[in-house]
Curated annotation (Swiss-Prot):
Superkingdom of the source species: Eukaryota
Assigned keywords, A-Z: Developmental protein, Differentiation, Repeat, Sexual differentiation
PANTHER family hit by this protein: F-BOX DOMAIN-CONTAINING PROTEIN-RELATED (PTHR31006:SF3), F-BOX DOMAIN-CONTAINING PROTEIN-RELATED-RELATED (PTHR31006)
Protein's UniProt name: F-box protein she-1
Record flagged with keyword Phosphoprotein: no
UniProt GO BP: cell differentiation; sex differentiation
Phenotype upon gene inactivation: Temperature-sensitive phenotype in which XX animals are self-sterile, do not produce spermatocytes, but ovulate and produce progeny when mated with males; XO animals develop as males, but some switch to oogenesis in later life. Animals do not produce fog-3 proteins responsible for controlling germ cell fate. RNAi-mediated knock-down results in 95% female progeny.
InterPro entries reported in the protein's UniProt record: F-box_dom (IPR001810), She-1-like (IPR042317)
Chain's role: Sex-determining factor which regulates hermaphrodite development.
Species per Swiss-Prot/TrEMBL record: Caenorhabditis briggsae
SMART domains recorded: FBOX
Result, substituting residue 111 to E: In v51; transforms XX hermaphrodites to females
Domain F-box span(s) in chain numbering: 24-69, 523-563
Length: 830
């Protein structure tokens, strides 16, 4: 009580109200109390609420601004972290959902949140919300791994005025968004984002809601998804509203004459290396936004004696008006000269002459006159030896280096729509029936047989294979000079010839960039080994995988060169295995596969050549293949992080590490006392400078690790940290080493080892004010000469390794209050 009165007295000195009362809280006027409460931090209010029960309603009547409220956890343990505007932290943990929800009811009642972050798993949370009669005031809300019913329940309790809503739908394959779109906050929010969405129809449904309610200009919706066909589906739904369209964006009109809706397909640094994720942005914009319009896209596909001319409307390109104008002019000049000199071609002319003359005159007139052509107009000109089943190809700017991107359409037939095709150069397997690309119309994908395993298309929308013997250099958007080849015309010898030609070209380009001399303009097999090694050393992982397949005779040479990665991630989720590697702050490799054998082969190769700064392994079953344990390969990494791995996978991976690992982090929810003893026999654990276990469930870890250090005479500065969901670890450590104690306090104990130069120091990470359901400890090997005055009493920095969110808000923040110390009145209404 005296400490609380002291805090209140300090607050009084800052008040502008007179007189200043030097008396008990209960004797103060209500207006003074209200002024005091309004200036208190949340921690002070929680303390005052427990000591002044008679006037709890007065304390609760004052709102408080909270910068962030983070609620996360599983049913067995919940954590709530609150950060005030000034950076003060309240961090609480609960094993009881009832206690957690009572605390949240109070926080939601008095708090005005800048950001509300929710990650809860369990039906009990939804059931509690249904009985909550209050409302939540928040500017932005982030839902992480929450199901649809829980999201709807939370949003139903939110006050008007929310500006941003973010949802991670990784578990939301059941999201239909139909119920979510009925909520007024979602309809009127300025910014809405869904990540990892796994269903169709979301884009046009959001746009339709905006049209129906006449949403404000600037309203934005963003989506990341692996689902194919959303862009095409959007076009089909709003075909009568299209204002303009390009390969990556479409603009539609709304019922309001001053407003349009713009849909964009976007890419970033992550998507630069794979096509499975697509990013969309939907925006409500003013209809007066300036945009260069070109009402037609012309493309010329020219062979030796065949010319195809196609005008495709209503496709519009937003740039290059003058370039298109020039291409139109030059195209018709060449075409006119050919037709004048070849009278025989007139009988092959498949178009009305006045249409052709109109297009020819268009070159010198205003290009906007093409709008007068009835849509859709297709003008086909076949010369004498023109092949049948020719496709229209509109080259576009490729998103990634080394790839080609087109809009493709079959001439004639029922389907003359344009479809997006991506030609991948990294795949060298041509054993399938089509090119290795994916279809933007139906999303058809297939796997090839090479190790890279890029994807391909074999569907009704694509009618040809784009292969080449020479270079393919498109001029801006419009003109492509190439030789279209059907795969049925290519025998196995021709395939091998194309592969060899591609390998030589790629090798030559790599050699040109190397510093070695001389530069060889020759086949790969004719190059000296030192040049090959120089080339391989400059290759990224995808290039090496391709070279491994094409140069099997020298695979050992390719595999002899190490490749360094800043970070590597192995993820096993359900039946999927994913690999993601980055270097120089850039993702350089991403792959997902459902085949456990293929995942094992790739992991085996990565163990052989990869050198990681930081290696992370997520989820369960990564090491469940018997061959993983039988394989001789070892991971090379400085830092290892095992996240939510089952205990068998954890032990298997630890046994497959090289000895120079510097840091190991793991979860302890499946580590039993017996498994911990097995882990302590692994040499990497015995010699690693730092390792920690998060959420261990037993009390024997501290003395077992210390005993292992004593037996192995571990080096000074060896460090072990652990969070324990059980009481008694500190006492058990003291009991085990009672004959070795050098010094002891409530939070620290120091023991001697068998080496007179070394002691072991145990520290409790949270002081006596903070009593939460789990305890954090640090164990260190220290010099026997270290004085107690040299101890680091600030625990926040090293606790940051166990719980980064605590350090995230403010380095001066303190930890406050436990649910047992916070009293609630029975039947209180929040």
């Amino acid at each position: 009580m005296s400490s609380h009165l002291k805090n209140l007295t300090e607050n009084f000195e800052n008040l502008a109200i007179n007189p200043i009362f030097n008396t008990n809280w209960c004797d103060m006027p209500a207006e003074i109390k209200v002024e005091c409460v309004g200036k208190m931090e949340l921690t002070e209010r929680l303390s005052l609420r427990s000591t002044a029960k008679a006037e709890r309603s007065l304390v609760d009547s004052q709102k408080i601004n909270i910068r962030r409220c983070a609620i996360h956890g599983l049913p067995e343990i919940r954590r709530v972290t609150l950060a005030s505007k000034t950076g003060k932290i309240v961090f609480r943990a609960f094993r009881s959902a009832n206690k957690e929800f009572e605390f949240l009811k109070y926080i939601w009642k008095i708090g005005v949140f800048e950001n509300l972050y929710i990650w809860l798993d369990g039906k009990d949370s939804k059931e509690k919300l249904e009985n909550f009669n209050g409302t939540i005031a928040a500017k932005s809300i982030d839902f992480h791994f929450c199901d649809e019913e829980f999201i709807v329940a939370i949003l139903g309790k939110v006050k008007n005025g929310v500006e941003s809503i973010t949802m991670n739908a990784d578990r939301g394959i059941s999201y239909s968004v139909n119920e979510i779109l009925k909520i007024s906050h979602v309809q009127n929010v300025k910014y809405w984002q869904i990540d990892n969405y796994k269903r169709m129809s979301v884009l046009w449904k959001v746009a339709q809601v905006w049209i129906d309610i006449s949403s404000k200009i600037g309203t934005t919706f963003q989506l990341s998804t692996e689902v194919y066909g959303l862009f095409h589906e959007f076009l089909q739904h709003f075909v009568d509203r299209i204002v303009s369209i390009s390969q990556i964006r479409v603009r539609i009109r709304t019922n309001h004459p001053d407003r349009h809706i713009l849909l964009e397909l976007e890419f970033d640094g992550f998507v630069e290396f794979q096509h499975s994720f697509k990013f969309f942005r939907l925006m409500d914009m003013t209809a007066n936004t300036r945009q260069k319009k070109v009402a037609a896209a012309l493309l010329l596909l020219q062979e030796q004696e065949s010319v195809l001319l196609t005008v495709c409307r209503p496709y519009q390109l937003e740039e290059g008006l003058e370039v298109i104008r020039q291409d139109l002019f030059s195209t018709f000049l060449r075409l006119n000269q050919y037709m004048i000199s070849t009278e025989q071609t007139k009988k092959y002319l498949g178009v009305e002459l006045e249409h052709f003359n109109f297009l020819r005159n268009l070159c010198s007139d205003d290009i906007s006159r093409i709008d007068s052509i009835p849509a859709p107009v297709r003008i086909h000109i076949f010369l004498k030896y023109a092949r049948e089943a020719v496709c229209v190809i509109l080259p576009g700017p490729a998103q990634f280096e080394g790839e080609l991107e087109f809009l493709v359409s079959r001439v004639g037939g029922d389907d003359e729509s344009m479809y997006r095709v991506v030609k991948k150069s990294s795949c060298i397997c041509l054993q399938k029936e089509n090119c290795h690309c994916h279809c933007g119309a139906c999303g058809y994908r297939h796997s090839c047989t090479c190790l890279v395993q890029e994807t391909g298309v074999c569907c009704k929308h694509i009618h040809m294979v784009i292969l080449r013997n020479g270079s393919m250099t498109p001029s801006f958007f419009l003109k492509l000079t190439c030789t279209p080849v059907s795969l049925v015309d290519v025998d196995q010898a021709e395939k091998e010839k194309m592969l060899m030609s591609s390998d030589i070209n790629n090798s030559s380009k790599i050699t040109e960039k190397s510093t070695a001399e001389p530069i060889y303009d020759s086949n790969w097999c004719d190059m000296p080994d030192d040049i090959k090694l120089e080339c391989i050393g400059k290759m990224e992982l995808c290039e090496r995988l391709s070279l491994r397949c094409s140069a099997k005779a020298e695979r050992s040479l390719v595999d002899s060169q190490k490749i360094e990665f800043h970070e590597g991630v192995f993820l096993r989720e359900y039946e999927d295995s994913s690999f993601l590697f980055s270097r120089n702050d850039k993702v350089v490799f991403w792959k997902r596969t459902k085949e456990i054998n293929e995942a094992f082969e790739l992991m085996k190769y990565i163990k052989k050549v990869g050198v990681f700064e930081h290696l992370k392994i997520f989820s369960r079953g990564v090491a469940d293949c018997e061959r993983f344990l039988a394989d001789d390969g070892l991971f090379t990494a400085k830092k290892m992080n095992l996240v939510h791995c089952d205990i068998d996978s954890t032990i298997a991976v630890l046994r497959k590490m090289k000895n120079d690992v510097e840091s190991i982090e793991m979860n302890g929810d499946e580590i039993t006392s017996g498994k911990l003893a097995e882990i302590l026999t692994i040499s990497h654990i015995q010699n690693v400078p730092y390792w920690h276990i998060d959420c261990y469930e037993e009390t024997d870890s501290l003395h077992k690790v210390a005993q292992m250090w004593i037996d192995k005479n571990s080096k000074i500065d060896s460090t072990f940290q652990i969070s324990v969901n059980a009481n008694g670890s500190f006492a058990e450590f003291l009991e085990h080493f009672k004959d070795r104690v050098v010094s002891q306090s409530d939070r620290k104990v120091r023991i001697h080892t068998n080496n007179p130069d070394r002691h072991i120091l145990l520290e409790r990470g949270l002081d006596e004010v903070v009593k939460i359901d789990y305890e954090i400890y640090r164990l260190m090997v220290i010099s026997a000469e270290m004085k107690e005055s040299e101890y680091d009493d600030n625990c926040k920095e090293w606790i940051y390794k166990m719980n980064p969110e605590i350090h995230y808000y403010d380095s001066e923040s303190s930890f406050e209050a436990r649910d047992d110390d916070f009293e609630w009145s029975d039947g209180e209404e929040a």
